[in-house]
């Protein structure tokens, strides 16, 4: 990818410092836990329509910007001025952390990825929303409106926010041509620069990465009969774990911090890994020799949903934020900053920060090649019983430990 946006160079001189600043800001604004774990979910309809004066959100870094990192990127201040609802943000680094924070209570909204959303729904941690209170839901990409990671039993559990693919990022000095298969991260081999990929490869450090290995085996070993990378029977699951164990010696780091991965590609000799468009855009803006591709096997991806806590203390401000978040200008600005694709297609045109080519660069037309993150459950559609997420979580810790 070659997409570069206006303020990227300014904010990426000290990439890690940005992440620290975001975290520090979030800590200052973190609300105290307010809802006991056993408290019954609040009714979807508010007792009053009066705005409560604040909304507390658990979010990925970079998703809720108020211009503190770059003045050109601020979709919080206008919302606060318009509604009187102060936005407090708690940054989470992983989906597991998001689930933990929401389970503890004290937050109104969460920008949950698909590997967290079903856990939040099944656990009663979030509640269905009334889309009649979110008029802009009508503008959401039809491909996302009833995504299986947030639309359950005929109910909408939140509003789509942003989405994107997990791309294969590579150093163009190590690869003369773009790799066409995920084999370059799963199997040891000599690269175009004459060196092995061993110790120069990374993998995502979340249990959901098991699905990436399953996607590869769907094509490499079709006899396994994998139809959905999030629905694996015992035999399929065993084969996927074996692939991941064989991959382990190749790995320089299991990553989850995008900024750390940027540094590893810049200074630590890493040349190939699964990644997000954000890192690709960042490294290219810093004049690093990287590019990205979605290989022939396809890719996993994330479609994040703004979900409402079952015990939300500020539901009216929360609904105002959900409506605001689907504004085309906001959607485009978020996509430009984060390197994602807007949930509202209208945002792809006429946004000065994103530009009219930004959506295509960030993967808008790759939707059908993406297997979006979804919490694995024992009850599954493609076969009788599947290995649930609890097993994925336990076993992936062992894989990362070389066991």
Task: Give the location of each predicted region.
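Bacterial N-terminal signal peptides
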Residues: 13-23
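Conserved C-terminal helix/tail region of periplasmic/extracytoplasmic solute-binding proteins
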Residues: 369-403
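Extracytoplasmic ligand-binding site segments that recognize negatively charged/polar headgroups
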Residues: 60-71, 106, 111-260
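Mature extracytoplasmic/periplasmic domains
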Residues: 304, 309-373
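Bacterial signal peptide processing site
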Residues: 25-28
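Extracytoplasmic/periplasmic substrate-binding proteins
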Residues: 250-311, 346-362
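Early extracytoplasmic/lumenal segment of secretory-pathway proteins
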Residues: 40-120
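Bacterial N-terminal signal peptides that target proteins for export
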Residues: 2-13
């Amino acid at each position: 990818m070659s997409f570069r946006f206006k303020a990227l160079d300014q904010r990426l001189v000290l990439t890690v410092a940005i992440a620290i600043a975001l975290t520090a800001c979030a800590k200052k604004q973190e609300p105290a836990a307010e809802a006991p774990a056993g408290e019954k979910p609040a009714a979807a309809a508010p007792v009053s329509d009066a705005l409560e004066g604040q909304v507390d959100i658990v979010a990925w870094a970079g998703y809720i910007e108020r211009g503190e990192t770059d003045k050109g990127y601020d979709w919080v201040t206008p919302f606060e001025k318009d509604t009187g609802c102060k936005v407090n943000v708690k940054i989470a680094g992983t989906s597991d952390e998001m689930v933990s924070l929401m389970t503890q209570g004290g937050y109104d909204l969460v920008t949950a990825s698909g590997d967290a959303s079903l856990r939040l729904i099944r656990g009663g941690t979030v509640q269905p929303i009334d889309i009649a209170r979110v008029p802009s839901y009508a503008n959401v990409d039809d491909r996302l409106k009833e995504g299986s990671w947030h639309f359950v039993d005929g109910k909408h559990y939140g509003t789509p926010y942003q989405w994107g693919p997990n791309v294969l990022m590579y150093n163009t000095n190590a690869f003369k041509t773009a790799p066409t298969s995920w084999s370059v991260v799963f199997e040891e081999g000599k690269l175009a620069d004459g060196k092995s990929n061993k110790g120069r490869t990374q993998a995502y450090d979340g249990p959901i990465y098991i699905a990436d290995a399953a996607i590869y085996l769907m094509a490499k070993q079709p006899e396994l009969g994998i139809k959905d990378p999030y629905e694996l029977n015992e035999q399929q699951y065993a084969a996927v774990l074996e692939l991941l164990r064989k991959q382990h010696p190749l790995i320089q780091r299991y990553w989850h911090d995008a900024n750390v991965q940027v540094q590893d590609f810049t200074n630590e000799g890493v040349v190939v890994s699964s990644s997000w468009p954000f890192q690709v855009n960042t490294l290219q803006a810093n004049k690093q020799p990287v590019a990205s591709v979605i290989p022939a096997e396809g890719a996993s991806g994330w479609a994040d949903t703004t979900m409402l806590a079952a015990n939300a203390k500020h539901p009216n401000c929360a609904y105002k934020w959900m409506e605001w978040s689907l504004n085309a200008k906001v959607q485009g600005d978020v996509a430009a900053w984060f390197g994602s694709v807007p949930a509202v297609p209208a945002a792809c045109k006429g946004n000065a920060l994103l530009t009219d080519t930004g959506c295509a660069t960030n993967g808008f037309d790759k939707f059908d090649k993406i297997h979006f993150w979804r919490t694995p459950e024992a009850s599954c559609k493609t076969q009788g019983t599947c290995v649930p997420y609890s097993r994925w979580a336990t076993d992936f810790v062992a894989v990362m430990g070389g066991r």
